Amino acid sequence: MLEKNKYLYIFRHIQTNQVLLSQGNVLKKTALFQLPYPLQKPVAPNGMRPAKLRKDHWVPLLKVEFPNESMFQSVFMQLLNYRKYRSVQPLTSDLLKLPIPVRRRKIMRQEVPNTIADLADILNKEKFPENSVRLQLSDKSDSEYADWPPSVQIDSEEIKLSRGFREKTTVDEAR
């Protein structure tokens, strides 16, 4: 039986460091609704949610391969729940002292480390077999944001930055 989807793709915005999760190797415009914004308006203030998905502004952050689709779905939903939980938490007193534009930028800058740490936390809680989850990063220093469980095997090859993820076979065949 062919697995429908067992890959999780995570993209980051090159200017704001916001993070989007995807089930495919390219982003769909509906992915923007993952970005936290409390009001139900199509355009968020001061760029908290871009009005349109510009694919040249989003670069691959990491790719995770799971043993099967059910594990992938579980981790994907938990990551979305972590993000939702984080967006409704009250701000710390240090953040409240900052002017609103500075506060928003600081919160957005923390999305990459928070997402990576959340992923590691979920993988620590789930009991996957050893080396069953493969992780490929665009920057090896990003792996330092978390303590990875033994079930995670970090790929030595970095992701090539482009407007989407490119599979190794596709790049090799093009040469």
Curated annotation (Swiss-Prot):
The signal peptide stretch is none
User: What this chain does, per the record?
Assistant: Component of the mitochondrial ribosome (mitoribosome), a dedicated translation machinery responsible for the synthesis of mitochondrial genome-encoded proteins, including at least some of the essential transmembrane subunits of the mitochondrial respiratory chain. The mitoribosomes are attached to the mitochondrial inner membrane and translation products are cotranslationally integrated into the membrane. mL67/mhr1 also has extraribosomal functions, being involved in regulation of mitochondrial DNA recombination, maintenance and repair, and generation of homoplasmic cells.
Q: Which family does it belong to?
A: Belongs to the mitochondrion-specific ribosomal protein mL67 family.
What is the organism lineage in this UniProt record?
Eukaryota, Fungi, Dikarya, Ascomycota, Taphrinomycotina
Q: Which GO terms describe its molecular function?
A: DNA strand exchange activity; single-stranded DNA binding; structural constituent of ribosome
Where does it mainly reside?
Answer: mitochondrion
Q: Which UniProt keywords apply?
A: Mitochondrion, Ribonucleoprotein, Ribosomal protein, Transcription, Transcription regulation
Q: What is this protein called?
A: Large ribosomal subunit protein mL67
Q: Where in the cell is it found?
A: Mitochondrion
What organism is recorded for this protein?
Schizosaccharomyces pombe (strain 972 / ATCC 24843) (Fission yeast)
Which GO annotations describe the biological process of this protein? mitochondrial genome maintenance; mitochondrial translation
* Subunit structure, as described in the record: Component of the mitochondrial large ribosomal subunit (mt-LSU). Mature yeast 74S mitochondrial ribosomes consist of a small (37S) and a large (54S) subunit. The 37S small subunit contains a 15S ribosomal RNA (15S mt-rRNA) and at least 32 different proteins. The 54S large subunit contains a 21S rRNA (21S mt-rRNA) and at least 45 different proteins.
Origin, by domain of life?
Eukaryota
Q: Could you list the residue ranges that cross the membrane?
A: none
User: What gene is this protein a product of?
Assistant: mhr1
Its Gene Ontology cellular component terms are: mitochondrial large ribosomal subunit; mitochondrion
